[in-house]
UniProtKB/Swiss-Prot annotation:
One of its GO terms (molecular function) is crossover junction DNA endonuclease activity. It comes from the Eukaryota. Its main location: plastid. It catalyses: Endonucleolytic cleavage at a junction such as a reciprocal single-stranded crossover between two homologous DNA duplexes (Holliday junction). The keyword Transferase does not apply. Disruption phenotype: Albino phenotype and decrease in cpDNA copy number. Disulfide bonds: none annotated. RNAi mutant displays chloroplasts with no chlorophyll and aberrant nucleoid morphology. This is Holliday junction resolvase MOC1, chloroplastic. It is found in: Plastid, Chloroplast stroma, Chloroplast nucleoid. It comes from Arabidopsis thaliana. Its cofactor is Mg(2+); Mn(2+). The keyword tRNA processing does not apply. A structure-specific endonuclease that resolves Holliday junction (HJ) intermediates during genetic recombination. Cleaves 4-way DNA junctions introducing paired nicks in opposing strands, leaving a 5'-terminal phosphate and a 3'-terminal hydroxyl group that are ligated to produce recombinant products. Mediates chloroplast nucleoid segregation during chloroplast division.
Length: 273
């Protein structure tokens, strides 16, 4: 099998991604925009002015993660394909690239391990992301400027310790800064959202389950998902597939849509009064 400089297979054929992703949609709860953990709009819990402020802040935050407008389609009219990138930003994570033609009839996938280097921290050698190699990896993808990148939000846990908190925040920030500077539209997604989408959010689910689901969606990449340490590859693929499902099924609610719904509710309240 032909490999790239990063040791990954070159553009293997995906196997009916849409036919396998869509069944999850019918069993998944409705989704709000990334960052939103509630399953429905929190109008009953928040005054409408606070809901508007929250929507505006989220819109400004998302705008700051892209050099192009979130609503602007930067794909050239004569382009033969569109791209979605999914990233697990951890040191053991990966970058997944999905390519689709305009008819959705053929799809390709690639996955790359996150480049990292050994660094001496005190008296211990630790891993840190290799910024230069990440830039080179992104440049080698040949992805149109303005393409969407879905990256898992960094949410450190108390048990991770200071080094875990530092490493997680450093990696997350490095990825976002590099992606925005490279001209991508970056959309952070909480782990609970994409895992719930693929029915992996229950306490009994493990990283092995992520590898299993990813292998089912991407059978041509199953050989790269066999080892336990390949969970980062699996999660990057699932994050990318989740992003494509949001785009295809129009489940991603934009802040402007939220504002229009807030305005509608305000008008309803005025009529009641």
């Amino acid at each position: 099998m032909a490999t790239t400089v990063y040791g990954q297979a070159s553009l293997p054929q995906m196997h009916s991604l849409f036919s396998k992703v869509r069944p999850f949609l019918s069993h998944s709860p409705s989704f709000t925009a990334p960052f939103t953990r509630r399953r429905s709009f929190p109008f009953s819990a928040l005054p409408t002015t606070k809901a508007i402020d929250a929507a505006l802040m989220k819109e400004k935050w998302l705008d700051s993660l892209s050099l192009t407008s979130q609503d602007e389609d930067t794909t050239p009219e004569n382009a033969e394909s569109s791209c979605i990138i999914g990233i697990d930003p951890d040191l053991s994570g990966a970058l997944a690239l999905l390519k689709f033609d305009h008819l959705g009839s053929s799809s390709f996938a690639q996955v790359y391990d996150t480049p990292h280097i050994p660094v001496l921290v005190g008296k211990r050698v630790r891993k840190r992301l290799d910024a230069k190699s990440i830039v080179q990896l992104i440049q080698s993808l040949d992805v149109p400027s303005g393409s969407r990148v879905y990256i898992e939000q960094s949410n450190p846990f108390p048990k991770d310790g200071k080094q875990g908190w530092y490493s997680g925040g450093f990696g997350y920030g490095l990825w976002i800064g590099t992606l925005v500077a490279s001209g991508f539209c970056v959309i952070p997604v909480s782990a609970s959202l994409w895992k719930r989408h693929f029915q992996l959010a229950s306490g009994s689910c493990t990283k092995d389950d992520s590898r299993r689901v990813a292998a089912e969606l991407f059978p041509s990449l199953s050989s790269q998902l066999k080892r336990k340490k390949d969970h980062g590859r699996a999660e990057a693929l699932l994050i990318a597939a989740y992003g494509e499902a949001l785009k295809t099924e129009k489940l991603l609610i934009q802040p402007k849509e939220l504002l229009s719904q807030v305005n509608y509710l305000e008008n309803q309240l005025v009529e009641v009064k």
